Amino acid sequence: MMAIDKPLDFLWFIPSSGDGQYLGSDDLSRPADPGYFREIAKAADRLGYSGVLIPTGAACEESFILAADLAAHTERLKFLVAIRPGTASPAYYARLAATLDRVSNGRLLINIVVGGSAQELAGDGIFLPHDERYDHAGEFFQVFNSLVETGKANLDGKYIKAIDARLGLPPVQEPRPPLYFGGSSDAAIAFSGGITDKYLTWGEPPAQVAEKIAKVRKAAAAQGKHVTFGIRLHFIVRETDEEAWAAADRLISKLSDETIAAAQEVFAKSSDSVGQARMVALHQGRRDKLEVSPNLWAGIGLVRTGAGTALVGSPKTIAERLREYQALGIDTVIASGYPHLEEAYRVSELLFPEIGLPGPHGQIRSSFGERRVFGGGGHGGNVKIASAS
């Protein structure tokens, strides 16, 4: 166990394929809308989140272009943007990354997504077997890292060949923007230990997270590297535990058994991801055993690929669960909640004070020092409270 000596680094999420209030239902859904994404990013920027994750995939907006747009509408927010090796050359991605880091004044974080759906990868023109994708990614980032760190690269590899590759303009961050990565297979863990700066795990029970952290630390040490750790979780936080569990039930209240079965069939047929298999194993497609660890709820994974668990509870309860993960070595949380605009406020307003994170940035004072309470926003303003004598 590790001593907890500083607050968590907390990022939010841009739902770039769309959003909604119910899983598995079109009721009160929100389409992929750039204006809505800007609202979420601006809220996260003000509410105290350090950054946002922008996902990648066939159903999502292109992550680099969306990040460039959001950077123009925010001041301090960082952008965790995906690179999928094989969809373009490492030299091209190096130019994208350096330029985005420059135009955002050093606000780029890079998320390495090797891919877990053979069907989607085939659509991108990638046909490598599972483990070979990590060998390919290793060569890809040899070239990428050399370019963004030194401006030049050469490699005569099995998968990647680069002859006198050049990058004319460096990124703002030195030696380069940080590399994040998540994967649960042996090949993924070996790759992470040698390449990445921060290893990300999906929200599994603490004992399973501890096992993965130990494996990554061992792989990193064998290669003379140091890796830090983060966790990807959804959040359902309310003032009381009872309200939070009611909100979790509401989120899947329009989800039919037929929709669950169809989603699970797609996961089984299209994915060779070990991490996805671990997510499915937590709930086994059943909605009657979704609390897989204290306050860790697997309901989202019934129909959502990728991160499928949420911490559910009051601020105090969730803070206790987060401290358990921190004690294992987790220092970063990539969070989300449905719908993402409203839940960004709930997590910031309810949970952040409990875990020692500051409130909104740039908050304007609401009085000359007298205590006031919200009075409904009428013409008379908020209600003054006489100080005790």
Curated annotation (Swiss-Prot):
InterPro entries: Alkanesulphonate_mOase_FMN-dep (IPR019911), Luciferase-like_dom (IPR011251), Luciferase-like_sf (IPR036661), SsuD_RutA_monooxygenase (IPR050172). GO terms for biological process: alkanesulfonate catabolic process. It catalyses: an alkanesulfonate + FMNH2 + O2 = an aldehyde + FMN + sulfite + H2O + 2 H(+). Its EC number is 1.14.14.5. CDD domains: Alkanesulfonate_monoxygenase. GO terms for molecular function: alkanesulfonate monooxygenase activity. The keyword Ion transport does not apply. Pfam families: Bac_luciferase (PF00296). SUPFAM superfamilies: Bacterial luciferase-like. The keyword Oxidoreductase applies. Keywords: Flavoprotein, FMN, Monooxygenase, Oxidoreductase, Plasmid. It comes from the Bacteria. PANTHER family: ALKANESULFONATE MONOOXYGENASE, ALKANESULFONATE MONOOXYGENASE-RELATED. Catalyzes the desulfonation of aliphatic sulfonates. HAMAP family: Alkanesulf_monooxygen (MF_01229). Belongs to the SsuD family. This is Alkanesulfonate monooxygenase.
